[in-house]
Curated annotation (Swiss-Prot):
Source organism, top-level taxon: Bacteria
Gene name, Swiss-Prot/TrEMBL: rplU
SUPFAM superfamilies listed in its UniProt record: L21p-like (SSF141091)
Keywords per UniProt: Ribonucleoprotein, Ribosomal protein, RNA-binding, rRNA-binding
Single GO BP term: translation
Organism expressing this protein natively: Levilactobacillus brevis (strain ATCC 367 / BCRC 12310 / CIP 105137 / JCM 1170 / LMG 11437 / NCIMB 947 / NCTC 947)
Protein's job: This protein binds to 23S rRNA in the presence of protein L20.
Pfam families found in the cross-reference section: Ribosomal_L21p
Subunit note: Part of the 50S ribosomal subunit. Contacts protein L20.
Lineage: Bacteria, Bacillati, Bacillota, Bacilli, Lactobacillales
Official protein name in the record: Large ribosomal subunit protein bL21
Molecular functions per Gene Ontology: rRNA binding; structural constituent of ribosome
Length: 102
């Protein structure tokens, strides 16, 4: 059984026992988290939400918080001696899916 959840403005396909990296959530490592925006539940009898499946939830445990690899942007203007270098590291939360309740 799998489900498609919405969190942080993105959709993720998850299964029980799977680790998924989502946009940063304001919870500590080791805490439980529940996703109630489930748009699809697959299995023997698939359920499609309009826009979400009523009563369906996905529960998981936060494993860790972290930062992704640095992304560097570099702007350059030829013959002007003008350049700008910026870096960014996107925060994420690693969640291990415990159960899909549909």
């Amino acid at each position: 059984m799998y489900a498609i959840i919405v969190t942080g403005g993105k959709q993720y396909k998850v299964e029980a026992g799977q680790a998924v990296y989502v946009e940063k959530l304001n919870v500590e490592a080791g805490e439980k988290v529940t996703f109630d925006q489930v748009v699809f539940v697959g299995g023997d009898t698939p359920k499609i939400g309009t826009p979400t499946v009523a009563g369906a939830t996905v529960t998981g445990t936060v494993e860790k918080q972290g930062l992704e690899k640095k992304v560097v942007t570099f702007k350059y203007k030829a013959k002007k001696g003008q350049h700008t270098k910026k870096g960014h590291r996107q925060p994420y939360t690693k969640v291990v899916v415990d159960a899909i309740n549909a």
